[in-house]
């Protein structure tokens, strides 16, 4: 297996720790006035989603995780699995609800998602950064109601709830940032 030194650590690097694939979220190089330098690293375990902090002595090596990120199109959900397809080979992969997690509310048919595979099995599903969804339920915006600047909650076609401006009505299609679950704009 390939190894990587602590001086090559950076955000997004995938490592094997305790026989489990992890991704580095943050890396801080610390050189104290007295003693050996070290790296303080914030890591998320890909299988469980737990975030933890770990320190590595300068010069230590870690095994690189044998994970693969591929872009697949979301097809459908049959209640138990979420099905994705490779557009070039037409190969289909089924991901369970644990791999999809909270991202299920951002899955729209035919949208391209990034799937992380470990030993050929999907362990995480990342939706596109922006999705366009229809508003299925929201309170009507009253003319002249400018009291609150926070907007109003709106339920989208996938079941997700986001805060939208007062002028958004039922049936409109809006663009949402899936990373922050925030309204971006109306789609013409």
UniProtKB/Swiss-Prot annotation:
Localization: Cytoplasm
Cross-referenced Pfam families: EFP (PF01132), EFP_N (PF08207), Elong-fact-P_C (PF09285)
Signal peptide range in chain numbering: none
UniProt-listed SUPFAM superfamilies: Nucleic acid-binding proteins, Translation proteins SH3-like domain
PTM note: May be beta-lysylated on the epsilon-amino group of Lys-34 by the combined action of EpmA and EpmB, and then hydroxylated on the C5 position of the same residue by EpmC (if this protein is present). Lysylation is critical for the stimulatory effect of EF-P on peptide-bond formation. The lysylation moiety may extend toward the peptidyltransferase center and stabilize the terminal 3-CCA end of the tRNA. Hydroxylation of the C5 position on Lys-34 may allow additional potential stabilizing hydrogen-bond interactions with the P-tRNA.
Keywords associated with the record: Cytoplasm, Elongation factor, Hydroxylation, Protein biosynthesis
Main location: cytoplasm
Family indicated by similarity: Belongs to the elongation factor P family.
Classification via HAMAP family: EF_P (MF_00141)
Name assigned to this protein: Elongation factor P
Organism: Vibrio campbellii (strain ATCC BAA-1116)
Taxonomy of the source species: Bacteria, Pseudomonadati, Pseudomonadota, Gammaproteobacteria, Vibrionales
């Amino acid at each position: 297996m390939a190894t990587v030194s602590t001086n090559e650590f950076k955000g997004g690097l995938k490592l094997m720790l305790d026989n489990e694939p992890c991704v580095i979220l943050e890396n801080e190089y610390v050189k104290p006035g007295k003693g050996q330098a070290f790296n303080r690293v914030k890591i998320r375990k890909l299988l469980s989603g737990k975030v933890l902090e770990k320190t590595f002595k300068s010069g230590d090596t870690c095994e690189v995780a044998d994970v693969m990120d591929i872009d697949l199109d979301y097809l459908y959900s049959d209640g138990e699995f979420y099905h994705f397809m490779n557009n070039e080979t037409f190969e289909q992969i089924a991901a369970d609800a644990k791999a999809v997690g909270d991202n299920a509310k951002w899955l729209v048919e035919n949208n391209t998602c990034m799937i992380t595979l470990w030993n050929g099995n999907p362990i995480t599903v990342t939706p596109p950064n922006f999705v366009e969804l229809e508003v299925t339920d929201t309170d009507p915006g009253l003319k002249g109601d400018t009291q609150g600047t926070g907007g109003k909650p709106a339920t989208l076609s996938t079941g997700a709830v986001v805060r939208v401006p007062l002028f958004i009505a039922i049936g409109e299609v809006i663009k949402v940032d899936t990373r922050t679950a925030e309204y971006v704009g109306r789609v013409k």
